[in-house]
């Protein structure tokens, strides 16, 4: 199972960073291609909650595996081109938060797709999206 490890720093408290991370209505602000999130079965802070993330016409059913505010959030996701488990931790570091993301993909199609998204830090790459998220969390912490 291919594994991708990413990290970024946000000059914002872990609680605020975690809360932004699980705000499904705002996911499109840092995850490229997300057009909507539907079919939410409960609170994303509850293990077992399900929802569907849409990338245009393609859906990615998702289930919450772990939600430990403000420290850790994990989901299993899956579409026909990318599926696996994403676990993100939020650790206090100085005056901010170290965000560490581990994505384990499943299947050969996911392996190829994930490899493309894992290269570099361009907008739309895994690292690029995490960097965008960290900057957004900092703007939110600054009130704006």
Give the label of every model feature segment:
Residues 76-128, 133-135, 144:
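Beta-strand/loop substructures that line and gate deep hydrophobic ligand-binding cavities in soluble
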Residues 1-42, 138, 143-144:
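Hydrophobic ligand-binding cavity/cleft-lining segments
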Residues 3-5, 58-62, 82-87:
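Short, surface-exposed coil-to-beta transition loops
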Residues 57-66, 75-79:
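Helix-adjacent hinge/juxtasegments
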Residues 11-15, 42, 65-70, 89-98, ...:
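A short, structured loop/turn motif at beta-sheet edges
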Residues 32, 59, 69-70:
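A generic structural motif
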